[in-house]
Structures are given as structure tokens and as C-alpha cells.
């Protein structure tokens, strides 16, 4: 069982792209991301990452984000930074031709949006 957290925004389809890619891997996946169907009632803005989301990230074995430049700021990058700070393995799946400079600057590996690439990365990092 691989526990996964996917930092995302709901204004693009990165979450569904990454979720579908995970579903095609040979791993049984438990998704700890925040689904659109049951978002948290409120986000505590006193924190860079809301404690409810921190808890979800702590449950995850890995964090899988997109390479989208929109991840350069906002909650997604804060979630990625938090995951790295607590030692979670983080990978960016290449869903666009352009990549986030922030994600690259954090040393997050970017892999092709392919099942075998994600499986190999998980094997190396879990």
C-alpha cells in the first residue's frame, strides 16, 4: 500500500492526471489529498500549511505534484516545502512543457508522465 498526497489546485486537471497515472501503476494507492467532494470546511491562514493538511501529508508515504509553473506560489508550494521539511519523498510529474522554477529550486525530481517512470521513482524512494 502506497499512501499518497497530491498538492493541487482545482482550477486545472493536474489532480485527475496524477491520480489516473497512480491508478495505472502496480501499486495499491491510498490517496490522502483533499478531494473536491469533501474539502475542509475552513483553512487556518495563521499557518503556511493548515494543520488539517499537515496531518494528511504526514500520513502520506510520498508526495506527487505536477511540474506546472502555477505551483511557484500559493498553497501547493507551501505543501511541497512542508513535505520536504518532514522528510517526505516528493516528485513532480511532467504534465506541462514548462516547469516550476520553485519546484526545481527545491531539488524535486521531475519525471515523465508515464506509469513506468512513476513506478521506478516509487521503488527508489519508498
Q: Which positions does each model-derived feature cover?
A:
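Conserved N-terminal substructure of TIR/SEFIR domains
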Residues: 1-59, 126
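C-terminal helix of von Willebrand factor
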Residues: 111-126
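Short, polar loop motifs at secondary-structure junctions
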Residues: 33-35, 94-100
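Conserved TIR/SEFIR loop-to-helix hotspot centered on a Trp-containing motif
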Residues: 69-86
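Glycine-rich, charge-decorated loop segments at or immediately adjacent to ligand/cofactor-binding or catalytic sites
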Residues: 97-111
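Structural motif
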Residues: 61-64
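Structural motif corresponding to alpha-helix initiation and N-cap regions
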Residues: 46-50, 77, 115
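A short helix->loop->beta-strand "cap" motif at the edges of active sites that frequently abuts
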Residues: 85-95
Amino acid at each position: 500500500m502506497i499512501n499518497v498526497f497530491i498538492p493541487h489546485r482545482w482550477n486545472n486537471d493536474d489532480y485527475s492526471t496524477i491520480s489516473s497515472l497512480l491508478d495505472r501503476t502496480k501499486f495499491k494507492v491510498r490517496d490522502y489529498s483533499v478531494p473536491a467532494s469533501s474539502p475542509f470546511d475552513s483553512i487556518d491562514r495563521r499557518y503556511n500549511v493548515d494543520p488539517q493538511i499537515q496531518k494528511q501529508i504526514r500520513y502520506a508515504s510520498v508526495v506527487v505534484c505536477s511540474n506546472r509553473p502555477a505551483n511557484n506560489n500559493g498553497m501547493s508550494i507551501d505543501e511541497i516545502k512542508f513535505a520536504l521539511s518532514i522528510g517526505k519523498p516528493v516528485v513532480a510529474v511532467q504534465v506541462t512543457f514548462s516547469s516550476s522554477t520553485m519546484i526545481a529550486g527545491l531539488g524535486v525530481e521531475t519525471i515523465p508522465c508515464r506509469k513506468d517512470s512513476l513506478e521506478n521513482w516509487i521503488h527508489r524512494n519508498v
